[in-house]
């Protein structure tokens, strides 16, 4: 299971 999802910053 995914415990941490990194924030993907698409500018």
Swiss-Prot record:
Chief location category: secreted
Entry superkingdom: Eukaryota
Subcellular location: Secreted, Cell wall
Gene Ontology cellular-component terms listed: extracellular region
The entry's keywords: Cell wall, Secreted
Record's protein name: 50 kDa cell wall protein
Secreted among keywords: yes
């Amino acid at each position: 299971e995914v415990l941490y999802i990194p924030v993907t910053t698409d500018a």
